[in-house]
Amino acid sequence: MTTNIKTDFSPPATATPVLEMQGIAKRFHGVPALQGVNLTIYPGEVHALMGENGAGKSTLMKILAGAYIADEGEIRINGKGVKITDPGTARQAGINLIYQELNVAPNLTVTENIFMGSELTRGQFLDRKAMELEAQQVLASLGASFAPTDIVGTLAIAEQQQVEIARALKDNSRILVMDEPTAALSDRETERLFEVIRKLRNDGIAIIYISHRMEEIYALADRISVLRDGQYIGSLTREEISPQRLVQMMVGRSMQDFYEHQRQSNPGPVVLEVRNISDGRKVQPASFQLRAGEILGLAGLVGAGRTEVSRLIFGADRKVSGEVFLNGKKLEIHSPSDAIAVGIGYVPEDRKDQGLFLEMSSRKNIGLNRLKQDANLGIVNWGSVNKIATDAVENFHIRLANLEIRAVDLSGGNQQKLLLARWLAINPRVLMLDEPTRGVDIGAKSEIYRIISDLSAQGVAILMVSSELPEIVGLSDRVLVMREGQLVGELDNSIGKEITQENIMHYATGASEVTAS
């Protein structure tokens, strides 16, 4: 039975909810996707909707936007019941959904995109002047810096997003749903979007914000509602938000259990040794050891050289100096193929551009690194590859209907597990992970942490690069910190230098000495 968490959120006494969804249920082929979900949104509120993949967030929002029709439940706008049967009736009710994949016509002007399907006319002709004037007014209200006559395809992604928002405002929308709106944005573009969202909030527009990025939720949300397994778990106010409570609500267990790794007090023998490795530019001569069953965290600010170290070891980039040893034997690694041949794996930070073959099947993506090993007289042993892929799907809880599903059609979390499965198929002695949970929801993070901990327990030596300090602190047996291309510090609880976020940042910024444990 689900227990709801009460909230102290106190809207003005006279405030009527702009949106109430009560008892919403939806089934697909008899399987419940939503079960009695409630959601209440107030004017001028940024309301975050959170939950892991499959929790029901997208289904609930598609019902609100008219893409699906609920099997049960009621929707009220400003206290009045409404029937939303298609996207048109949703827009008439003042609801607009801005998808992660932008819905703009790149070859048309900003004005033409804003008024698409609702053009202004004078007699039998389009009234372009009136449309451009109204478009300019809406864009000005958003603080946009581009012109109504600009071609949308020439704009940055963040500006194209503003075009979509402008189109919604032109339709007098009072409820905006934003689904992972920062997924393709830079940090600067993200902050610009936040400014727009805050302005919309001040204008009384309600925003339902879907994101797995905790830092965005803390920066924007007035309240948070959480779904899990198609059920409403509860809501929190800004004051009640904490990582511990969110994790417990989303995955059903405490933060203490989130990072399952038990720190190694007596790690195994040295497996990987790096001596004075350098690319002559971004990485100054760096030396360290990595032991069997150890998770070695590599921390530092963006641009510190962490990724570059991993790529040098893997042979993806050319080193100008340094040596790499595996089990005491000097390696000659000139390419990733050389690294793979000796049992060194590397999960890159950008799974879409550097890791996966998106149009290829899940089966082939998983088996890619085993094809050479399993080839016999030029004939691939697909039976072996199929078994590896089937076992990986089961062991890693990869959610897909069948092995022929393309990687591009999977969620971020399942894509990342697919990539992990590919590297584990070669039975690596050393596995380097670069931002292993970037762009995945909290449920997938928990599963990936379990996989990493299991590998460590099996004796795999793991080098983990991460910008998420709780991840580094929660999983690492030791932590090396880089600053401006140099290794500047080591944290290890067993030698009296405590692994904490504060101590990592002291080294990363050069601010002060670390705190002893």
UniProtKB/Swiss-Prot annotation:
Membrane topology: Peripheral membrane protein
Keywords tagged on the record: ATP-binding, Cell inner membrane, Cell membrane, Membrane, Nucleotide-binding, Repeat, Sugar transport, Translocase, Transport
Pfam families tied to this protein: ABC_tran (PF00005)
Keyword Transcription regulation (UniProt): no
Reactions accelerated catalytically: D-ribose(out) + ATP + H2O = D-ribose(in) + ADP + phosphate + H(+)
GO cellular component: plasma membrane
EC number(s) given by UniProt: 7.5.2.7
Binding site for ATP: 51-58
ABC transporter domain mapped to chain residues: 19-254, 253-509
A GO molecular-function descriptor: ATP hydrolysis activity
Enzyme class: translocase
Top-level taxon: Bacteria
Main location: membrane
Cell compartment(s), UniProt: Cell inner membrane
Family assignment from sequence similarity: Belongs to the ABC transporter superfamily. Ribose importer (TC 3.A.1.2.1) family.
Complex and partners: The complex is composed of an ATP-binding protein (RbsA), two transmembrane proteins (RbsC) and a solute-binding protein (RbsB).
Chain's role: Part of the ABC transporter complex RbsABC involved in ribose import. Responsible for energy coupling to the transport system.
Protein name: Ribose import ATP-binding protein RbsA
Source organism of the structure: Trichormus variabilis (strain ATCC 29413 / PCC 7937) (Anabaena variabilis)
